[in-house]
Structures are given as structure tokens and as C-alpha cells.
A protein has these predicted regions:
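Acidic, surface-exposed loops and disordered segments
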Residues: 1-303
Length: 303
């Protein structure tokens, strides 16, 4: 049975050049959709096995003879490229240094982010892993302070209209269904932050998206793993850091926009798509002199 996603239904087509194939079996070892199997010294394709070809491209990438092509489920023969040489890849120390140097930036220069950098950020985000191929992650790009402010104002208006939902009486009614932790979050964070957004806007200050010159909203289809847009957003954030941009993840809009058909239509978001996350970008207006050590809540090695 083929895997259905927001962009694919059915199996991808697998072609093997048997004149070049040595039946080494590497493609079979990495094939988890299971259409490939080795029998009598020959690699066979049976799309009725398990999910059939899901278009992950693992067999193409591992084949030492370049004798396999896969087409379908948003994968094309021209998508195959050489793996970057080891010398051109970041070392652990270089990657860790980039991560340590990154801070959540909320103060930006009055300077536009160039289209070239936006393209690079999106290109980096597209390399993120996904639950099921092809990726269902989508991005709403808000380029320019005016567009970002329009989005911020729309979100604050929506939050203002839904403020009653987080009032004490509603929290009391919902507590048996959403739990103590969610109710406490409504009381100590959601309702107060909505009040702050509204008050600061009245004072001419954007405390939601911080007057950023660029914002991206990552979201995904109802078929996808809910984590997919957050992983892509993380890749985008690190790419922005490598390009000299400051960034900050803004999680507040996601749960609200999920239930607003009006805003989904306005910003080109499919009505049934899951909630996502906003990342703001821009040239930092402040320079950080120190890094901060972070800690996980817990690491437990099971014995």
C-alpha cells in the first residue's frame, strides 16, 4: 500500500540499469519502503511489497555504480548531486561554534535582507529531514518591514478577538479536557502576553515580531509529522546565522493562525494545515560579547 502525503499518492518508479548493476545489494539494505529485494543474484523491484517505493532516494544515493534512477513523489533524476567533499564540510567544532555564537535576536537594523540571502535560507531549509517523503513543509515569506508588520497586526487582532478564550471562567471549564499544565500556561503566559502585545502596539511598539525586516512562517500538511516545520525552521535559523543575520523563533502565532480560516486564506495557507512556527530575521542592531551555556532538562541513559 503506497504512502499518501499532502503532495504524493502512489509509488515512485524505480529503474535499474542491469548492464551496470553488480548486485552488490547495498540498495536493498537501505530500502525501507521494501520494493527492492535480491534474489538469485539480481535486484528486483516489487511495488506491492510493504509501501512500495516512497521516493526517499536512498537506493540512488548509495549505489556505487550510479545505475539506479527513481522518479516520482517529487523526486526527479536531475535532483541527484555529488556529496560535498569532506574538506568542504563543517567540522564538529565549526558547527558547534556557529550554534554557540547564535543568540535569539530581537533588535534589528533598519536594513532590508537581500533576496539572495532569502534564497539561500530557503535552500538550506529544504534540506531538512522529514517524516515521510516528499516534504510537506511550506513557508510563507514576509519580505520587508511593511509585510511583517501587516502580519503582526493581523495576529494581534486575532489574539485580541480570542482573548476571552483564556479568561478564568473558560480555563475552569476546559481544565478537565486540556489539563493543569495547559491551564497554567494560559494563565501565566498566554493571556499576559496577549495583553502586552496589545498594549505595546498602542504605544507604537511591535513586541510580537520586533519590527523585523523578514519573517518566515513554517507550516505543514495534516499528513505530515508535526515536527517537520520546526526542523526546517531550525535549519533556516542556522543558515541565517551563517549568513550574518540574527534570528528568533516566535511560537505564539502558530496555535492562533491554525484556527483562522480568514488569515489562512489571506496568507496562502491550506485550511487544514497544521500549526507551525515563525522565524524572524534581520541584521542585528546589537553585538553580543559573551555566549551562554544551555542545559537540557534531563539526559537519562537507560541501563
Amino acid at each position: 500500500m503506497s504512502l499518501k502525503t499532502g503532495r504524493a499518492d502512489g509509488t515512485a518508479t524505480v529503474r535499474i540499469d542491469y548492464e551496470e548493476c553488480t548486485a552488490c545489494g547495498l540498495c536493498v539494505r537501505v530500502c525501507k519502503g521494501a520494493p527492492l529485494y535480491l534474489e538469485s543474484g539480481t535486484v528486483h523491484v516489487d511495488q506491492t511489497r510493504l509501501f512500495g517505493c516512497i521516493g526517499c532516494g536512498q537506493c540512488v544515493a548509495v549505489c556505487p555504480k550510479n545505475c539506479i534512477t527513481v522518479e516520482g513523489r517529487d523526486l526527479f533524476p536531475d535532483d541527484i548531486m555529488k556529496i560535498p567533499s569532506k574538506g568542504s564540510r563543517a567540522t564538529y567544532e565549526q558547527l558547534k561554534s556557529l550554534m554557540i555564537a547564535r543568540r535569539s535576536v530581537r533588535n534589528f537594523k533598519d536594513r532590508a535582507v537581500e533576496h539572495e540571502l532569502i534564497d539561500k535560507i530557503i535552500d538550506a531549509a529544504s534540506t531538512a529531514p522529514m517524516g515521510l517523503p516528499p516534504a510537506d513543509t511550506e513557508i510563507v515569506v514576509l519580505h520587508g518591514s511593511e509585510k511583517v508588520q501587516e502580519f503582526a497586526n493581523d495576529m494581534i487582532d486575532l489574539m485580541h478577538n480570542l482573548k476571552w478564550f483564556f479568561a478564568p471562567f473558560m480555563r475552569l471549564l476546559m481544565r478537565p479536557f486540556i489539563g493543569k499544565e495547559a491551564c497554567e500556561s494560559f494563565k501565566t503566559f498566554i493571556l499576559p502576553i496577549i495583553e502586552i502585545f496589545i498594549k505595546k502596539r498602542e504605544e507604537g511598539e511591535d513586541s510580537l515580531l520586533y519590527n523585523a525586516p523578514l519573517a518566515m512562517y513554517f507550516h505543514t500538511s495534516p499528513y505530515a509529522d508535526p515536527a517537520d516545520p520546526f526542523i526546517s525552521a531550525t535549519y533556516a535559523m542556522l543558515a541565517g546565522e551563517s549568513l550574518g543575520l540574527g534570528s528568533c523563533m516566535i511560537g505564539t502565532p502558530g496555535p492562533f493562525i491554525k484556527y483562522s480560516k480568514k488569515l489562512k486564506r489571506k496568507y496562502g495557507i491550506h485550511l487544514r494545515n497544521q500549526q507551525g512556527i515563525v522565524v524572524i530575521f534581520g541584521y542585528p542592531a546589537v553585538r553580543y560579547s559573551q555566549a551562554l551555556k544551555r542545559r537540557l532538562a534531563n539526559v537519562h541513559f537507560y541501563q
